[in-house]
UniProtKB/Swiss-Prot annotation:
Part of the ABC transporter complex ThiBPQ involved in thiamine import. Responsible for energy coupling to the transport system. GO terms for cellular component: plasma membrane. Belongs to the ABC transporter superfamily. Thiamine importer (TC 3.A.1.19.1) family. This is Thiamine import ATP-binding protein ThiQ. It comes from Vibrio cholerae serotype O1 (strain ATCC 39315 / El Tor Inaba N16961). The complex is composed of two ATP-binding proteins (ThiQ), two transmembrane proteins (ThiP) and a solute-binding protein (ThiB). InterPro entries: AAA+_ATPase, ABC_SmlMolc_Importer, ABC_transporter-like_ATP-bd, ABC_transporter-like_CS, P-loop_NTPase, Thiamine_ABC_ThiQ.
Amino acid sequence: MLALDKVRYEYEHEWFEFDLNVADGDIVALMGPSGAGKSTLLSLVAGFIEPVSGSIKVNDQSVLGLAPYQRPFSMLFQEHNLFAHLTVRENIGLGLHPGLKLNAEQKQQVVDAAQQVGIADYLDRLPEQLSGGQRQRVALARCFVQPNPIWLLDEPFSALDPLLREEMLALVKQLASERQRTVVMVTHHLSDARAIASQIAFLSQGKVKVVSDCQAVTAQHPHPELAQFVAAALNEPK
């Protein structure tokens, strides 16, 4: 389980305080208005920034003070996931060894991962030779070859067209289920959350205001801020 307890952080005189529990195997979508603290929460968990106080634990073990690479998380962002000078094969291989010193079994893992995400034909290409969707497939492959039990996704597919986004989300859901991974994903698309998540954590004004079963999140939700947010989201063009 990932557990955040009274995690406080200050940025430009604005305070954030997060409480959130994510059970093993769950997929939780972080949603809320701009500036609510979604990416801040993810950055605190990942270790890119440190809280003023509070605790962040994975299976009752604190991760505070650990560098990002020492924490049990794999991360996927909207962009800047790949090293431009490395091939697809090498970019995926980094998930197994930072120096790319792979044994025969690990080299086969890279090939298998590429096949699972549909990029086996591009293993020796550079990222600049790929489309945006193909680059995100490479990043996803590197994400899941790592042994880390929790994936942190920060709007990884928001720049893709709706059909491709839907395909990538289905792939994440499938791979997470097969590998029994926990997923925490920031998204501003309600449809994305409904496609992949078991729960939605709604953030507003620097706090997690409510955590709700994904299918119960409607414009009639009893929490007024969440209901208003959903109503606005449903009226937005897809």
